Amino acid sequence: MRVVGGVLGGRRLETVSTDAIRPTSDRAREAIFNMLVSLELPDGARVLDLFAGSGALGIEALSRGAAHTTLVDSDAAACRTIAANLTALGISDRAKVIRSDVGRYLAAHGDPVDLAFADPPYRFDGWSDVLDTVNANVLVCESDREIEPGSNHAWQTHRVRRYGTPVVTLLVRRDSTGPRTALS
């Protein structure tokens, strides 16, 4: 696996050796960031990577101009891999790795971010809790199915794309405002 774009494009990422973690493919990550460009996220964006695994999505955001990324995963091996990737790429100072259950983390930390990624294991059934508690302007959900906001009127679906088995749902907060410049 590698960083697809930005200043770290082409650099290799270590992955976690466990069946519970399913890394986002290079192709899907590139497509996700192409979709995000149209939303003109702020330069220096604050990013939250939930169920971070190897940290590929959060690291990709840093490579493309995000100022800071918080990466959350409950798996100790995943957190060690993320920390090793950040160190190898020389970007540890722009990221924070937190070992925690995502639900507990979101309940305790409501700091706003510009962009959040949520890439839990397939068959995850806590999507409504994530939608209710994540404080982001844009939420990228990767799952085995489309994630619909349902009765949560804070979110609207911007795009849905399938990349083999994974389905990427891009949600935008209805009340998000503020100056926008591109996250390239």
What are these regions (language model features)?
Residues 1-184:
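Class I S-adenosyl-L-methionine-dependent methyltransferase catalytic core
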